[in-house]
């Protein structure tokens, strides 16, 4: 059973727009999710995801906070040892992608929205 780590900046977005994918992944994989405390964390846990509460300032531009996020992602990669990482939204894409690159973990970055 492969381990998949999902990095996102809100459980409401992940649960509201990507829950079908999460449920499908749970059928054959161990799914770990890194999120800040949010409205749908409990629902994701009840479905079978292993949750890690990672604070993210979604709109902030504080480089110290962003370095902290990068370090938190590096620690998660070391602790979980996922086979692949799936990232959503800008900060998880950027800092999760960098952490995966440094840790040599394959990752898939997703951009949300209409692209306009």
Task: Label each residue range with its predicted role.
Residues 58-84, 94, 98, 102:
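An amphipathic, basic-hydrophobic alpha-helix
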Residues 87-93, 111:
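Short His-centered aromatic/hydrophobic patch
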Residues 14-17, 64-71, 106-108, 115-116:
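Nucleotide-sugar donor phosphate/pyrophosphate-binding loop at the beta->alpha transition
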Residues 2-5, 100-116:
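Active-site proximal beta-strand in glycosyltransferases
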Residues 3, 30, 81-84, 106:
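Structural signature of beta-strand start/N-cap positions in the alpha/beta core
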Residues 6-65:
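N-terminal strand-loop element at the rim of the active site
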Residues 35, 86-87:
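Short beta-strand scaffold positions
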